[in-house]
């Protein structure tokens, strides 16, 4: 991919544990390897499931390959979750890695892939 598309080398992170993770509302421990790069202004994220009940394991158990989800960054994760819930779209999985908090929404049937919505948590200002 690097040569063909001219994208930078992938930055790799191994054995990353998702903090505060839930899968269908149940607390779980999820461990994943990640690799990140960019193609123009699009982030490419490769994931390799290591352990724990999760949408990643479910995807593999169903014999699927390829695109798992499309992610977007937002400023206020909770407001987006609320808006999707109003439309009948539920949260399937949640987690946090460092300051990045994210959810996966049940959009596969209507959108063709799961939608990941994430927010980078900001420092609280001292008053």
Tell me the role of every PLM-derived stretch.
Residues 1-8, 80-87:
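Amphipathic alpha-helical segments
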Residues 5, 65, 112:
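Structured loop/turn residues at beta-strand edges in well-structured enzyme cores
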Residues 6-12, 19-20, 24-45:
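Short, well-structured hydrophobic secondary-structure segments
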Residues 14-29, 52-63, 67, 87, ...:
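A cross-kingdom feature marking solvent-exposed beta-strand/loop segments within repeated
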Residues 31-43, 59-76, 82-127:
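Vicinal oxygen chelate
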